[in-house]
UniProtKB/Swiss-Prot annotation:
It catalyses: 4-CDP-2-C-methyl-D-erythritol + ATP = 4-CDP-2-C-methyl-D-erythritol 2-phosphate + ADP + H(+). The lineage of its organism: Bacteria, Pseudomonadati, Pseudomonadota, Alphaproteobacteria, Hyphomicrobiales. This is 4-diphosphocytidyl-2-C-methyl-D-erythritol kinase. The active site is at K18, D146. The keyword Kinase applies. It is an enzyme of class 2 (transferase). GO terms for biological process: isopentenyl diphosphate biosynthetic process, methylerythritol 4-phosphate pathway; terpenoid biosynthetic process. Catalyzes the phosphorylation of the position 2 hydroxy group of 4-diphosphocytidyl-2C-methyl-D-erythritol.
Length: 299
């Protein structure tokens, strides 16, 4: 029996990669959380969460990045399960959760948070709790600052601007589905380490978005920043040549996502994306080099 065969009522959800097209650090709160302005899209590539009712709780992991996943209660997937069960009551059925781990760990594309968000959505349906997005987002925020963002991504997939510590969400119009290459050479960067390496925490916020069409979006991105990039490069200098490689392969725009070290590159069309992905994969065996498309803005 494979991990995705059903023995009873079950749900499978995509936990999409979260791509920070731009990330401005605008301050820091007294409790240590940084204030951020972020333009975020979600990719059609990601992890998958499969949950079914069972006789007892269980958690299993498969996939190319399964080996680095903690199986105990420290895992965000299990924290999400337990938080929702605490909210819904002790009579909720046991569940078997399977995580197909396709995204690199500690790579700046929201893998663990997206897994937890997909778990909240799947269990909300499986347990018939009927909690609205705001309630699920509040539960998610108790687990991590980027859970509300990732919950939006798993539920809707549409681009957004996130502010505050990541909990203030607003839709962005005009962003098309972007042919996008995600690349990681195996470098893992812990988000707290990158934030600790910041030398400047008071920066200008994002300018008003101007994203109608891919060319306009790329022009807009050139006016924005990833304020975590210098800190990430100080910890992992290999990020810089990776960005140069993506630009040399014909990317319209390339940048590091989030706290790194995954980089993204936007291409003009699917054929340019496919060609670049193949060349990079052939030249760099063992790299995570995955072609994808982001989900577009609401029509």
């Amino acid at each position: 029996m494979t991990a995705f065969q059903n023995a009873g009522p079950s749900i499978t959800r995509l936990a999409p990669a979260k791509i920070n097209l731009a990330l401005h650090v605008t301050g820091r709160r007294d409790d240590g959380y940084h204030l951020l302005d972020m333009l975020v899209v979600f990719a059609d590539q990601g992890d998958r969460i499969h949950i079914e009712k069972a006789g007892s709780d269980s958690f299993t992991v498969s996939g190319p990045f399964a080996s680095g996943i903690p199986a105990g209660r420290g895992n965000l997937v299990l924290k999400a399960r337990d938080a929702l069960r605490q909210h819904g009551g002790p009579d909720l059925s046991p569940v078997a959760i399977h995580l197909e781990k396709n995204l690199p760990i500690a790579s700046g594309i929201g893998g663990g948070s997206s897994d937890a968000a997909a778990t909240l959505l799947a269990l909300n349906t499986l347990w018939q709790l009927d909690l609205d997005f705001e309630m699920l987002a509040a539960i998610g925020l108790s687990l991590g600052a980027d859970l509300p963002m990732c919950l939006h991504g798993a539920a809707h997939g549409t681009p957004l601007i996130a502010r505050g510590i990541g909990e203030e969400l607003n839709d962005v119009s005009g962003i098309a589905a972007l042919p996008m290459l995600l690349v990681n050479d195996g470098t893992a960067l812990a988000t707290p380490d990158v934030f600790r390496a910041l030398t400047r925490r008071e920066n200008a916020p994002l300018p008003p978005p101007a994203c109608e069409g891919t060319d306009a979006l790329c022009a807009y991105l050139r006016e924005t920043r990833n304020d975590l990039l210098p800190a990430a490069i100080s910890l992992a200098p290999q990020i810089e040549p990776k960005l140069a490689l993506l630009r040399a392969k014909g990317a319209l725009y390339a940048r590091m996502s989030g706290s790194g070290a995954t980089c993204f590159a936007i291409f003009s069309d699917k054929s340019a994306l496919t060609r670049a992905a193949k060349e990079i994969a052939d030249e760099n065996p063992g790299w995570f080099a995955v072609p994808s498309h982001s989900f577009p803005s609401r029509a």
